[in-house]
């Protein structure tokens, strides 16, 4: 019954399989950092970003290596995080459409909330009420009681949520006051919408911005709101008066990040122009340029360990996170080093960050080579690398070499059908397998660099082999004789067969490889590490998630059928031979040209010779005593095969001929002729 239910479930949705080629421990942010949270009690900084990983860092400057741990469960960009319960719990929002609840001290995911139907872009937190709100591109806002979320278990896994409706466009920013009495959302609608989270009642809509509202802040009692927009302005709103009471034109481009001191007197702003300003809200003409980053600013986090704040952490579209000192900033008025005309360039307060959390490189360019197995990539440091998709690993770092030259250098006149797709969104290689083309690529074991125990050269399906390797640890895929009768049979056949057979028998992928089952629209159904599929819980979830097209290969061992290619075989015009009846032939698309040459020699040329000569005295037909190898040698000596008047390499296969030489619609046509002696 369970299996029947699983197949029905799989039938209702198209499930893809993805995996990430990466190191076991990814110590450094590999892409832009979208969110920051500081835990001053433990001197820890949490970063969350576009590589899908949340990392914990020590902000103790005496520590040589600040990295503490990674929190991994998301499969797409992490867009926002909030620390709750005095730093014990972390809530995260992601483009994988989930909100996750983490034990922040121990670094593990406690539960996953799947209420959103699209990217979750923003979170808001009411500290006094332990209330969190989440919002995103599905235009929905959901309210979560943190104490309820942290009490969820495998058996007690139902949670009730309130929702705030009324947004007409995708939500990009969210704010809630500490008391949990006001919530504000910002969206591409260019307005601020305001609710009372206690009653879910809509209170007002505030107009004034002319572009997306990317950042929002509320004061403690919820009477004032600050907003930053892609229109380049910061606005201060009075919720009591339901209007904008001040507009700050500080930046040259969009404002994407805001922070404010506890007294709500100074706003810190950053955005597309890479500059970070501090502006006195009471005197809009007075502002100081704190620093200039090397990339657009995505998020900032004030160090609130003292008042005024001694420093600010800044995250950008690059992977490095910087801490900038704010010491002396509130004396800028006296020194006169401030900007009251944003058209005049001013000197930044800081030219170097006080502390740096170094980031790693992000892959920004890739090229799939002709063998449809290897990939060349280029990263943000201009380093080129060579990867093996089949074995899910990096083969070689090539350094700062010319990317296009490396592609040309590795070009082979070979055609293998596409059987996977590549995504670079996280800055790492994510490979996706889809039922529609996963099994399109067959190669010979020899061409793939694999040897068979019996010395044969079997045909291997790349997608099938990879799926078997990804699920190698899942007990359901193991060939394991369970009952006594089977054991007796295998005992007769020898000890070898009595062993559990795992994987594909040719190669393994790194056990730490993340494997993701997701709907073909982006929603993740299940993520696990390759090595964990033997666990009881993981195995049960795989039973519910793995689609039938993967079961067929990994569990039932039903390999797909070979791809056939139709073609016509005719004598070349120069041979003077009579054109044959145009029979449409069909063969495996991996069939080598030499095999067609053998067919021509044995079935056409030899038969012609036989009809023109008398039978020998012992009535033996020509070629009967020739071995297969001799026929192959003779065929290559005597026969030429051509396509589009180009003589073909005997090692080329039919699909390569069709792709590189035929290059036309309709069925492939090959011509043969005898070599001139």
Curated annotation (Swiss-Prot):
Annotated positions of the Phosphotyrosine modification: 28
WD repeats: 28-67, 73-112, 115-154, 166-205, 208-247, 250-289, 292-334, 358-397
Principal subcellular localisation of the protein: nucleus
Tissue: Ubiquitous.
Family listed: Belongs to the WD repeat WDR48 family.
Stated consequence of mutating residue 214 to E: Strongly reduces interaction with USP12 or USP46 and abolishes stimulation of their enzyme activity
Subunit structure: Interacts with USP46. Interacts with USP1. Interacts with USP12. Component of the USP12-WDR20-WDR48 deubiquitinating complex. Component of the USP12-DMWD-WDR48 deubiquitinating complex. Interacts with PHLPP1. Interacts with RAD51AP1; the interaction is direct and promotes formation of a trimeric complex with RAD51 via RAD51AP1. Interacts with ATAD5; the interaction regulates USP1-mediated PCNA deubiquitination. Interacts with RAD51; the interaction is enhanced under replication stress. (Microbial infection) Interacts with papillomavirus HPV11 E1 protein.
Function (record text): Regulator of deubiquitinating complexes, which acts as a strong activator of USP1, USP12 and USP46. Enhances the USP1-mediated deubiquitination of FANCD2; USP1 being almost inactive by itself. Activates deubiquitination by increasing the catalytic turnover without increasing the affinity of deubiquitinating enzymes for the substrate. Also activates deubiquitinating activity of complexes containing USP12. In complex with USP12, acts as a potential tumor suppressor by positively regulating PHLPP1 stability.
Residues modified as N6-acetyllysine: 214, 578
Residues recorded as bearing Phosphothreonine in the entry: 613
Annotated phenotype, changing residue 119 to A: Impaired binding to USP12
Taxonomic classification: Eukaryota, Metazoa, Chordata, Craniata, Vertebrata
Protein species of origin: Homo sapiens (Human)
Subcellular location: Nucleus; Cytoplasm; Lysosome; Late endosome
Result of altering residue 580 to F: Impaired binding to PHLPP1. Defective in stabilizing PHLPP1
Name of the molecule in the record: WD repeat-containing protein 48
Effect of mutating residue 318 to A: In UAF1(11A); impaired DNA-binding. In UAF1(11A); does not affect ability to promote USP1-mediated deubiquitination of FANCD2 and stimulate RAD51-mediated homologous recombination, because of DNA-binding mediated by RAD51AP1
